[in-house]
Amino acid sequence: MPTEANTYDPQRIESTAQHYWDSTHAFEVNEHSNKPKYYCLSMLPYPSGALHMGHVRNYTIGDVISRYKRMTGHNVLQPMGWDAFGLPAENAAIKNKVAPAQWTYKNIERMRTQLKSLGYAIDWSREFATCQPDYYVHEQHMFTRLMRKGLAYRRNALVNWDPVDQTVLANEQVIDGRGWRSGAPVEKREIPQWFLRITDYAQELLDGLNTLDDWPEPVKTMQRNWIGRSEGLEIQFEVRDADNNALEALRVFTTRPDTLLGVTFVSIAAEHPLALHAAKSNPALAGLLTEMKQGGLSEAELKTQEKRGMDTGLKAIHPITNEQLPVWVANFVLMAYGTGAVMAVPGHDQRDQEFANKYGLPIRQVIALKEPKNQDESTWEPDVWRDWYADKTREFELINSAEFDGLDYQDAFEVLAERFERQGRGQRRVNYRLRDWGVSRQRYWGCPIPVIYCPTCGAVPVPEDQLPVILPENVAFSGTGSPIKTDPEWRKTTCPECGGPAERETDTFDTFMESSWYYARYTSPNAHEMLDKRANYWLPVDQYIGGIEHAILHLMYFRFYHKLMRDARLVDSDEPAINLLTQGMVIAETFYRKNPDGSKDWINPADVNVECDERGRITGATLISDGQPVLIGATEKMSKSKNNGVDPQIMVTKYGADTVRLFSMFAAPPEQSLEWNEAGVEGMARFLRRLWTQVHHHAAHGPATALDITALDTAQKAMRCKTHNTIARVEDDYGRRRSFNTAIAAVMELSNTLARFDDTTTQSHAVRQEALETMVLLLNPITPHTSHALWQTLGHPETLLEDLPFPKIDTTALVRETTTLAVQVNGKLRGTIEVATDAPREHIENNARTEPNTARFLEGLTVLKIIIVPGKIVNIVAR
């Protein structure tokens, strides 16, 4: 009869291990170590109230790396905190009629418990939430410094404005041009906003990517494209009104000055000063500008919207031909990008061509390929787009360009640049797609921007001795406006410069501000200043882990803020993280039923019975509650919208944390998508039960004697060889390859080999002890609770396994005395032979010929030759 001790009971095992870790403060670290430091960090979670499988995968990857690094002799920091400000708390406050702070802190309590149940080796003494004043006070300090240095400034910018709720909406809150809650048509409104001059660091951010050798190439490519460095000319176009009066000149940046003779009109943004000037005397234009203020500001929406425009009646003077070009307002030109004006070359720009064809504007060809590959490349048509029209990588020459005919791109660029610079009408310029970071949010639940507005002194930074500016947490939040805007006691204050009446800034910071420097605060969480000398001990982060969806915004601001802290002499390093791992998504099947109106009701996989074919593919599905069919959707990322998420807590309760951890590491390599499959989870549970039984069965035969490698027979040596080969594989998988699935597979192979090792001698017991100890230690980074318990079962005192060294390879064990060779006859496998690794050729040939099955196939044949591939194959050629 199995006893409680030798039955695999995950809840008991995990509770015991976690109690030991907590009571010994096992994972709290400091800087006073003679070991090399290693800082492993997974992106901090938003406290939504419940972990999802994406969290589990992310934090398990980080935990595996952290525990492995500790076993290889490193002083490892793995902290945790909460990205606690943001929109979801406001939405929950509206829905549940509870203050955002109360909702947030309650969720943190719940999620902390969930994380602890998974057994992560986290230094909880460094925990903080970004909504705590003793965190964001340092962010406010930094902002006031940036104001004084001119790196923080205020200007007007467009936002999505809900006129009913009287609030600014994020792009994702604009649905079909309407506010998500009020349903009112959204307006584009220009309001004052605070910005950080990230563009001052554009080139450094670009150059720094070349030093990030251990960041994924796709992330670096996305950042390069987002920074968008381009070299071109800025050219001035004189502008005249209908009465031929000169107006302010238009500045246009172009990377294609070679197409200048193809310009047939100029496009400007609806907010451009010239558009506003023209609208004063043109009611139709004024009406269009008002319409263009409707709808959202997201790039996706702007790309897909119908192209619209109107002639302003103004004329731009072509800087070479002096031709009068119409100036059009176009809804695809944005004031925030470049100069808000574009020289339109419809013959060689697809967007301009579509616009010109819609409004009947002239289209001219000014480029021809020198060596067209086919008829399409020899043909230019004004109403058909072909990619070669705009491809400057091909060899082409200018045509229809007067004195510039025959020039290629580079020659035309140089000639025109020299001409305009000589005339004072243009200059070479490096431009960036990157725009300054708008950090103002017209929301309540965020860090208050530390600025005071005085009628006399203007915008004044809050003095450092008056920081933090604390956000009041006990408020009634309705979603209409912000509580701090309507709270005169909080809003009204005194100007720190003149002592006169003044008001506080009621905008709060973009939550990317908090998540751009949190990693540094973990290094010195109780420091009076933003950071102290401990930061330079731990930074940069050695391993950062998070989704590739953060490639542009978070990871760009993360790098930028690190440079701000460096320039403030808070850190010594240039980049915040050495290695970046972008884990794949967790995906799952989707099921649904269609409603009469065409909408879909998504059904959770846990509520569905499925039928599968012999290959395991789903062929049918029914709803458990009514037995009726449901439709099978695509396999997609787990999400609330598709209702295909799996609650990690249910899985932990059902199978145990180690089983969930093991499956999440075994099902796919870290960078690839993981398809959730409960049958796979059950398979991992079976493996852990089998390992548990193996260890307890072995331990029941008493302690092992000391291993004497000189006394081992061939089978025992082969078993040791398998053990140490496994160490070598797993060490490479953990350390270099980060291939945890193959590490697990290697341990499973070792377990299976050991199960077939049925020798019962004293030395075989010692060999088995070594193999089991090895498996327990190799699995410890992934299944730490089970390893903690089994280590004691194998006769060791309770200890922190991470403080034990990772198993060492005995190279003498890898030297096999015998080797197995496959024997082929005319290329077909007929048998195997076991020979000494140093056996002479004659011995190998004789053994191969006389192998019983091989000998049968050689009867009546003449052996022509024997080919030996050392260590692998013997091929006998006969006829």
UniProtKB/Swiss-Prot annotation:
Listed GO biological process terms: leucyl-tRNA aminoacylation
Motif 'HIGH' region: chain residues: 45-55
Main EC class the enzyme belongs to: ligase
InterPro entries (alphabetical): aa-tRNA-synth_I_CS, aa-tRNA-synth_Ia, Leu-tRNA-ligase, Leu_tRNA-synth_edit, M/V/L/I-tRNA-synth_anticd-bd, Methionyl/Leucyl_tRNA_Synth, Rossmann-like_a/b/a_fold, tRNAsynth_Ia_anticodon-bd
Alphabetical list of CDD domains matching this protein: Anticodon_Ia_Leu_BEm, LeuRS_core
Main location: cytoplasm
Superkingdom of origin: Bacteria
SUPFAM superfamilies: Anticodon-binding domain of a subclass of class I aminoacyl-tRNA synthetases, Nucleotidylyl transferase, ValRS/IleRS/LeuRS editing domain
Motif residue range(s): 'KMSKS' region: 637-641
Catalytic activity line of the entry: tRNA(Leu) + L-leucine + ATP = L-leucyl-tRNA(Leu) + AMP + diphosphate
One GO CC term, this protein: cytosol
Entry-linked Pfam families: Anticodon_1, tRNA-synt_1, tRNA-synt_1_2, tRNA-synt_1g
PROSITE patterns xref list: AA_TRNA_LIGASE_I (PS00178)
Residues holding ATP: K640
Cellular compartment(s): Cytoplasm
EC number of the protein: 6.1.1.4
Keyword list, A-Z: Aminoacyl-tRNA synthetase, ATP-binding, Cytoplasm, Ligase, Nucleotide-binding, Protein biosynthesis
Molecular function GO terms recorded: aminoacyl-tRNA deacylase activity; ATP binding; leucine-tRNA ligase activity
PANTHER family given in the database record: LEUCINE--TRNA LIGASE, MITOCHONDRIAL, LEUCYL-TRNA SYNTHETASE
NCBIfam families per the UniProt record, alphabetical: leuS_bact (TIGR00396)
Family named by the database record: Belongs to the class-I aminoacyl-tRNA synthetase family.
Protein name: Leucine--tRNA ligase
Organism: Xylella fastidiosa (strain 9a5c)
Gene of this entry: leuS
